Structures are given as structure tokens and as C-alpha cells.
Design a protein with these regions (language model features):
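Repetitive helical segments and hydrophobic/amphipathic motifs
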Residues: 11-12
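Lipid interaction determinants
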Residues: 6, 15-85, 89-152
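Bacterial N-terminal signal peptides that target proteins for export
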Residues: 1-5
Length: 152
């Protein structure tokens, strides 16, 4: 009886060790609704800015990130230099980020002002797989990739 109990406990321990974190691709493919990607406050990394790759656009110190939490109507992240937060409103395919505040570190050469100006416009968004596109007047102005949390 003791051996059976020990065997069952060992099996239970092994089953409980299974990783619950999926890749960003699994996260994206498991979503029932595009807006659910915002409900869970997933982190997005900037991959292009105004038609240029993020690093070519001047984000050489740190890759900017964006987190949108629809449940709390909040946005936040990092501009490539400073951490920021603000209010986020998602209506249909429209995203508005407003009342942005940030830390005030100095970082030479980072196009942070332009990043904040673009982010604070009312933008249309689309999500294609793991890529979030923010557009203004039909032009893609920023693209973000769903950050793979398991890679850290």
C-alpha cells in the first residue's frame, strides 16, 4: 500500500511540473477574439517605426514595448528610454492612448518624442498572427510583435 501511495505521489508531482507558459505564437493562436490579446495585458515589442526597423529608426538603447490592458483601460511600456503609462481606449478597431506620463531620464538620440506623439493619436489597429499594426490614414506607422515571455 505504501508503494502504491508513493508511486501515485510521484506521478502527481511529475504532472504538476508541466510548464504552463506557452510561446507567443501559442498565445496568439489560442485567442478567440483579437481584443483578448489586450485583456491579458500581453507585452508587445516595437519592430518598425514609420517604415523603418526599430533600431534603424533610432531605438538603439532599448526596444520600446507596449502593454494594453482593456480590463483596466490602461496602457504602458517603455519608450526605448523611459517607462510610461496612460489611459487606453479600444473601440472596435480603434485604439486611443491618452494622458500619457513617463519617467524623465535623458537618452541621447532616441526618438522618444516622436514615439509618444504617434502613440497618442487615435489609431486603427490590426493583429495579424503575432504582429500588432498601428495605422493612421491607411499608413502603418508602428508595428509591434507579441513578446515571447518564455524566451526570457
Amino acid at each position: 500500500m505504501k508503494k502504491l501511495f508513493v508511486a501515485l505521489m510521484a506521478v502527481a508531482a511529475l504532472v504538476s511540473c508541466k510548464s504552463t507558459q506557452g510561446t507567443s505564437q501559442e498565445k496568439a493562436s489560442n485567442k478567440q477574439n483579437i481584443s483578448e490579446l489586450f485583456v491579458e495585458a500581453n507585452q508587445w515589442e516595437l519592430i518598425s517605426f514609420n517604415g523603418q526597423a526599430a533600431k534603424e529608426a533610432g531605438f538603439t538603447l532599448k526596444t520600446p514595448t507596449l502593454v494594453i490592458n482593456m480590463a483596466e483601460n490602461k496602457a504602458g511600456g517603455n519608450s526605448g528610454c523611459n517607462s510610461f503609462g496612460g489611459e487606453a481606449i479600444v473601440e472596435g478597431s480603434t485604439l486611443t492612448i491618452d494622458k500619457v506620463f513617463s519617467t524623465k531620464m535623458y537618452c541621447d538620440g532616441v526618438p522618444e518624442i516622436e514615439f509618444f506623439q504617434m502613440l497618442q493619436q487615435t489609431l486603427n489597429y490590426t493583429i495579424k498572427g503575432e504582429v500588432l499594426q498601428l495605422t493612421k490614414d491607411g499608413q502603418v506607422i508602428m508595428e509591434f510583435k507579441l513578446k515571447d515571455e518564455s524566451a526570457e
